[in-house]
């Protein structure tokens, strides 16, 4: 009996020693995290207006930038807002699919699946861009080009969902023929405009860069939201009782707020150096855009549930399949545009270094 107790105590002693060594093991396994640096210690390309500190140094190993997810720096809120939003979209859709016994192969479900895919894509591309862009100048351009591809994919995924699930009959009768082709073109134009502006203009950025970004994206938004805006306006004029229409209303409002903070560097413009880690405009843009996407998701799930009969009356399997194939065509065109401009950037950087 005594021997058994001594053996057990010996085992516990070894386990205790291992536990005491655990922090050291974890520390050795993680990369050494360099301190963040002020704007004067990073190249001009990485500097943001009115953001004085919190920059990650360039030129380190990839794992440093991945592990900077847990470091305090001026991009970490941008990363976490879209990471949490992506997880929320995924979990909400999974719960909906389980509760509704979603028919995955049904024609009726295809636009919904593409909308979910597009939402996860844009959120993931965005968080990767903000997490990894500090590695080098080429990485900076590459990941922001990927971000712009994600935005174009999300724009068209939203257009598909709005067209198939959310449009009312009066709007549909007038615009059904050219809405999706125009939405696909505007989605590509948004990606091309953002990529070109990133490639063409250097910091400090001129106003023309913002125009190249905002105008195509604004046109895409106006077109993509038109079926929803028309339905919401009619609903509110008639004393709206539709729950989905209220979610669509929130979607529009949150997007407009996010667009303001994307276009204007506030509040950091009025408090330079005070909003470096938390509170600058791009972080607020990310937060409101995430809430916009979650509101949009709720509205589309309600439309998917409640308007199936309208869907079946309007759309045959062939038209739905063709529209869904165009989603992947748009993604390929946007990716090709980004790859072309990345090639030009790489050639320019190589020439500069030689």
Curated annotation (Swiss-Prot):
Any Gene Ontology biological process: response to steroid hormone
GO MF annotation list: nuclear steroid receptor activity; steroid binding
Membrane topology of this protein: Multi-pass membrane protein
Pfam families given in the database record: HlyIII (PF03006)
Tissue: Highly expressed in the hypothalamus. Also expressed in spinal cord, kidney and testis.
Ranges per topology, Cytoplasmic: 1-75, 133-174, 235-243, 305-319
Keywords attached to this entry: Cell membrane, Developmental protein, Differentiation, Lipid-binding, Membrane, Oogenesis, Receptor, Steroid-binding, Transmembrane, Transmembrane helix
Topological domains annotated Extracellular: 97-111, 196-213, 265-283, 341-354
Transferase listed as a keyword: no
Transmembrane segments: 76-96, 112-132, 175-195, 214-234, 244-264, 284-304, 320-340
Family: Belongs to the ADIPOR family.
Record's miscellaneous remark: Non-classical progesterone receptors involved in extranuclear signaling are classified in 2 groups: the class II progestin and adipoQ receptor (PAQR) family (also called mPRs) (PAQR5, PAQR6, PAQR7, PAQR8 and PAQR9) and the b5-like heme/steroid-binding protein family (also called MAPRs) (PGRMC1, PGRMC2, NENF and CYB5D2).
Job of this protein: Plasma membrane progesterone (P4) receptor coupled to G proteins. Seems to act through a G(i) mediated pathway. May be involved in oocyte maturation. Also binds dehydroepiandrosterone (DHEA), pregnanolone, pregnenolone and allopregnanolone.
Protein name from the UniProt record: Membrane progestin receptor beta
Organism: Homo sapiens (Human)
């Amino acid at each position: 009996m005594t021997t058994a107790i001594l053996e057990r105590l010996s085992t516990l002693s070894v386990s205790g020693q291992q536990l005491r060594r655990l922090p050291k093991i974890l520390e050795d396994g993680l990369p050494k995290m360099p301190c963040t640096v002020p704007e004067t210690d990073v190249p001009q390309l990485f500097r943001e207006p009115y953001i004085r500190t919190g920059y990650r140094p360039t030129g380190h190993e990839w794992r440093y930038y991945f592990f900077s997810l847990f470091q305090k720096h001026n991009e970490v809120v941008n990363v976490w807002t879209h990471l949490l939003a992506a997880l929320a979209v995924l979990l909400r859709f999974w719960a909906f699919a389980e509760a509704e016994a979603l028919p995955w192969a049904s024609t009726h479900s295809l636009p919904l699946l593409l909308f979910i895919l597009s939402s996860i894509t844009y959120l993931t591309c965005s968080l990767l861009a903000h997490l990894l862009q500090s590695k080098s100048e080429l990485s900076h351009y590459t990941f922001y080009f990927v971000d712009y591809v994600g935005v174009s994919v999300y724009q068209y995924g939203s257009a598909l969902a709005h067209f198939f699930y959310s449009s009312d009959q009066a709007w549909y009768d007038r615009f059904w023929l050219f809405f999706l082709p125009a939405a696909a073109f505007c989605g590509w134009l948004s990606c091309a405009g953002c990529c070109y502006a990133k490639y063409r203009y250097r910091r400090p950025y001129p106003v023309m860069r913002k125009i190249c970004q905002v105008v195509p994206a604004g046109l895409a938004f106006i077109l993509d939201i038109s079926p929803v805006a028309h339905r919401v306006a009619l609903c509110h004029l008639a004393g709206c009782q539709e729950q989905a229409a209220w979610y669509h209303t929130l979607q529009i409002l949150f997007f407009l707020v996010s667009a303001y903070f994307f276009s204007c560097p506030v509040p950091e413009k009025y408090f330079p150096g005070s909003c470096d880690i938390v509170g600058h405009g791009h972080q607020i843009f990310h937060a409101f855009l995430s809430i916009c996407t979650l509101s949009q998701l709720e509205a589309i799930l309600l439309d998917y549930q409640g308007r199936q009969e309208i869907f079946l009356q309007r759309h045959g399997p062939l038209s739905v399949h063709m529209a869904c194939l165009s989603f992947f065509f748009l993604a390929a065109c946007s990716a090709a545009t980004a790859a072309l401009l990345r090639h030009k950037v790489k050639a320019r950087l190589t020439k500069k270094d030689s």
